[in-house]
């Protein structure tokens, strides 16, 4: 699919990885709806930066766990841009809780993580599906994690939410075929993100040494794969790990 003059919704578009994805899509000519739950000032700044690519961009507030807000978001984006070609589900929430500390994994924490990371993407996909079907084309890319490929990550709820998102990708690929393609990117530890902000260079290097490519992936690697999925015409239901080969080595 040619991305020039397309319209992309990027949830979590004001975050570190979300911003990089927005810029990668905008560099291909896509107009961007930068969706945020908090920090309107930051989202507005991102939208302003994106116009430097010669595209239109605007911030939109939305709590993806609330289906009514998601429906309003889709309506507002459609009214502003006239169409929706791409949905990137990048909004996420996590709290670091060791797997064996079940007392700290309260029902409230579990529910919040699952609601944002899994139910939120479901709301967004369900809301954009009628628009994309009517247009006869659409691309949806979910941002999961290698924690969804095996029992790893910073909490049980996070790993389960990302595993669910990977399976939701497959199910929605079936539900929305043949014109709407649904794929998933599963990043590992990415340099330059909040996940690595508190790690020392030695810790990052130690993690990278366990990867086949002997390096850590970064936000650009992830954003490039998102663009590849959006441009692809025959790939759907696929999850690609962006971790330099660490997750299966």
Which residues fall in each region the model found?
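The beta1-alpha1 cofactor-binding region of Rossmann-like NAD(H)/NADP(H)-dependent oxidoreductases
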Residues: 40-41, 61-73, 107, 220-221
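Active-site helix of classical SDR
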Residues: 125, 161, 169
């Amino acid at each position: 699919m040619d991305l020039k003059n397309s319209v992309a919704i990027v949830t979590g578009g004001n975050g570190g990885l979300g911003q990089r994805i927005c810029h990668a899509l905008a560099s291909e000519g896509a107009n961007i709806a930068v969706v945020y739950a908090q920090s309107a000032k930051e989202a507005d700044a991102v939208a302003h930066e994106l116009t430097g690519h010669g595209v239109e961009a605007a911030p939109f507030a939305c709590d993806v766990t609330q289906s009514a807000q998601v429906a309003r978001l889709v309506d507002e984006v459609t009214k502003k841009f006239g169409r929706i070609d791409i949905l990137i589900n990048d909004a996420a929430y996590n709290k670091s809780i060791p797997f064996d500390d079940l007392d700290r994994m309260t029902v409230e924490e579990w529910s919040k993580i699952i609601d944002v990371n899994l139910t939120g993407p479901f709301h967004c996909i369900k809301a954009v599906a009628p628009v994309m079907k009517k247009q006869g084309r659409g691309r949806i890319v979910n941002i999961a994690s290698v924690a969804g490929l095996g029992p790893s990550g910073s909490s049980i709820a996070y790993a389960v939410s990302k595993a669910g998102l990977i399976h939701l990708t497959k199910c929605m690929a079936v539900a929305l075929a043949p014109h709407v393609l649904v794929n998933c990117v599963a990043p590992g530890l990415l340099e330059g993100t909040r996940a690595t902000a508190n790690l020392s260079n030695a810790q990052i290097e130690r993690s990278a040494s366990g990867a086949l490519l002997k390096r850590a992936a970064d936000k650009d690697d992830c954003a490039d794969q998102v663009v590849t999925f959006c441009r692809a015409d025959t790939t759907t239901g696929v999850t690609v790990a962006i971790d330099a080969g660490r997750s299966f080595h």
